[in-house]
Design a protein with these regions (language model features):
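Flexible, glycine-rich beta-alpha linker
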Residues: 13-34
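Substrate-positioning beta->alpha
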Residues: 28-34, 48-70, 77-78
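Mid/C-terminal beta-alpha module of Rossmann-like enzyme folds, strongest
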Residues: 68-127, 159-162
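C-terminal amphipathic/interface module of NAD(P)-dependent oxidoreductases
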Residues: 88, 127-162
């Protein structure tokens, strides 16, 4: 990224870099798709509220951010992080997905210590548990400083959001 910005700083090209946080939206892939599928089929465990913090952005807002950066001369040569500006816990994401699927949210959850025990069994499991229950939060203040404001939110999700 830095080499690209250095090379293009000597040209008249408008180059900016946008690093998206966890992206959700139609046809979501990766861990969010796996979680959604597991909740739908009934095998994904109810997550505990660990107060972890995760940044996310809806694909529509990411497109808006990309268009803003491409069109704003202040963005030339800059690196931005795209988020919806809110922090979400994994439990909130789990509950939102239950809502999308019209499934009731269980009143219980798998205790965190069971995830910790599983994580101690192998580095692969530890990595998965960390991705599921760990923090992954970023600031989009720099993007907001050029006028970006997310229009979609996790709490407003419906079946078209995944």
């Amino acid at each position: 990224e830095l080499k690209l910005l250095k090379i293009t700083s000597k040209t008249h090209l408008h180059v900016s870099i946008v690093r998206p946080s966890l992206v959700y939206g139609p046809n979501v892939k990766g861990n969010l798709q796996l979680m959604l599928s597991g909740i739908k089929k009934g095998w994904f465990p109810p997550l505990p509220e660990t107060k972890n913090r995760r940044s996310m952005i809806h694909v529509d807002d990411l497109v808006r951010a990309l268009l803003l950066v491409a069109d704003d001369s202040r963005a030339n040569g800059e690196i931005y992080i795209a988020t919806d500006g809110k922090l979400h816990s994994s439990r909130e994401i789990y509950e939102a997905m239950c809502g999308v699927l019209a499934k009731s949210v269980p009143q219980w959850s798998v205790p965190k210590f069971l995830f910790d025990i599983a994580a101690s069994m192998s580095s692969r499991i530890q990595y998965k548990v960390s991705k599921l229950l760990g923090d992954e939060c970023y600031s989009s203040e720099k993007l907001q400083s050029i006028g970006f404001k997310a229009q979609r939110s996790l709490k407003e999700m419906n079946e078209t959001c995944f």
